[in-house]
Amino acid sequence: NGPFSLDITDSFFLQLKNKFRFVGFNQDCSNRPLSVIYNDFVKEYKYDRYFFFDDDTNVTDGFLSSKTNNSIDVSLPIIKSITDNKAYYPRVNNIVCEHDIFLNDSDYVISIGSGLMITSKLIDKFNAEQMTLFDERYSLYGVDFSLFRRIKMLRTKNIQINIEIAGELCHSLSRVDGCESTFRIRERSIDVVLTKILYPTENGFTNYLSILKVLIKTVARMDLQGLSILTYVIKHRAHPRSISYLLKRKYN
């Protein structure tokens, strides 16, 4: 996904072609929202299982062999930082999980998208509720978490969703592995504000306070452009890039 094209003679792509029977190569330099890309991916290709990986993830040799449970809807790996080899995700009931486990219906889990495996059974359950898996009001940060927030919504309707944690991956986590750029700080701020608006906690005051803190920090950094972006997000309840893309799709 843009903004720059990739070469089909790329060495990694050629290695994949030599290893697997079929490797598709799709790219879009329009820099579509990640949520839209994910949702379009599972709509276009009909398979039993779907895996998502970031380009800064190291996949271990035994990763796929840990994904053998046919009764699950979602499988998540333990995510360790490339820098310090510590586990940071998944978080089950706000505690980092560091071992393989089958989750209870009452457990609330969040994790990053890399290494995520979803099945066609999960997609069918979302389709039955006329919901997309990933919230397209998010564009970058927050896209992966939106899946788990939506799973929680389905569970409140007594819809059974089986989730396991199995295997592990090493991933470059920007907040752990180095200083964040202005771009990433802005994107994380958008994520916080959007989440407090779209998936608020029961304590309304806490939601408003969290948004206010983000705005104050943005002002303290003298980031007037960032403040303008956040004001736009609060008004339209979506990421600017998501709004732009969804409007184009609506009228095309």
Question: Model-found features: residue ranges?
Answer:
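Conserved donor-nucleotide/metal-binding helix-loop-beta segment in metal-dependent transferases, i.e.
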Residues: F63-L76
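Catalytic core of nucleotide-sugar-dependent glycosyltransferases
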Residues: L169, C179-T206, L227-Y245, R249-Y251
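A short, conserved alpha-helix in the catalytic core of glycosyltransferases
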Residues: L122-N127, E136-I165
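Acidic donor-binding segment of Leloir-type glycosyltransferases
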Residues: N1-C29
